[in-house]
Amino acid sequence: MGRSYYVDDGVEKYFSKLIQQQKAYVTGLLIGQYSSQRDYAVLAAQTPQKEDQSEETKSGFSKLEGIDDEWVSMHASQLGRMLPGGLMVLGVFLMTSPDLSKDAQNVLRKLVFTVEKSSMKNRLWNFDDDDVSERVTLHICSATKKITCRTYDINDPKSTPKPADWKYQSSGLSWLTIDCSVRVDVTIPLTSSSLTYQERQKSIRLGLVKWAKEIEDSLVLFNGQVKDKSADLFEEQKKSSRSSSHYSPQIITANVLTAAPLIDSTRSTALVQPCKSSLTIQGVVKCCGYIHSNRPKVKDALQAVKRDILNTIQARCEMLFEDMMLNGPSKGTENEVCPLPQRVFVPIKGSSLKLCDYLFGDETSSDLQSHFLEIMDQEVEQNELEFPEKKCSCTQPEERESEPVSYNLESKPVDQANSSSKFLLNKGLLISTVVASIAVIISFYYII
């Protein structure tokens, strides 16, 4: 028996709007959540048109061969950054006129594997045994509105399509919000102070992978309680009366506790690594995750919040280096504090879910609105934007205790008397000390 997708009726309305545009074809992404029992689709977003495609895609003037799968995968990468924990790209959709329907399934198969490959490229986490490996493809005929829903196993390149049910829900889907603020403190040694941005980005990723293991192994408290991973998130509901068994809190607070490595009796060997500079990511970031409220499990809540932590740090690092490669370093970058992208949340209309985006210091709310329209195909009002992280005022480190999200590049010689309070290179051994801050900062300390 194939998978069943329970779909928010807003997706049906969105498809109706696309049909009215009378294009020969439209590609896009499906957003939602997989679970062991049911799968949920909450949003659909069409792929932004390329500039040279505007005339080509008018009815009667295009063929499916003109679909650029790399362009669709780039859209998926950009959109993936805007999804909080628990939400993901479920698959792809293709809307065509009747004369183009014949080759739709071949195109969808190619797209779904390309999109998944792109989405997995820079993840700091790996799928586990409980993750669903099937991705959905949806073909809609713009004339008859007939829907063909199939799934592919993305772990098998030779996977054959399986039929699936696409069920619209007249009532809104119910979601549980997991709210979390996490302190991040990562120091990454760099072997050379003259690394290119690409080389530096690779080094940073290797360091983040090690940090990601700490997050994966961390202990999470839900509303101050430790819960068994395999248990229901709300065990007390089982003991309550039937009249109140339908109730569950809509927002719970998570606290993430990372512990220092345990010291045992086994012999350990110190790792000596030559280092010219180091990069430090520090501070507190705002995170959230969503799981469907139908008998939520602890393991699902853990997965949602931990993956959101990893995703938001990875996204900010990627965006920072993309901005540097595109615009070059700012003047005086070696000695000044620069804001990292600020996380901004936007509620989905008619739902308790929220999407997110990132705002650089020189960008405005209008830029965010334009980006949401381009990537998510959603119009956002300025008063709907939520800023849980304050902008960094670029103060000195000792004045930055309440400042989130900043980027600090600093050059200091180590032969000064007070340099040992930061970083010290002594006979090839690098000793780093933790610097308390509520900002997310990236600091380079160059060692001479």
Curated annotation (Swiss-Prot):
It holds the Pfam family ODR4-like. It is found in: Membrane. The chain crosses the membrane at residues 76-96, 428-448. GO terms for cellular component: membrane. It is a multi-pass membrane protein. It comes from the Eukaryota. Its main location: membrane. May play a role in the trafficking of a subset of G-protein coupled receptors. PANTHER family: PROTEIN ODR-4 HOMOLOG. Belongs to the ODR-4 family. This is Protein odr-4 homolog. It comes from Xenopus tropicalis.
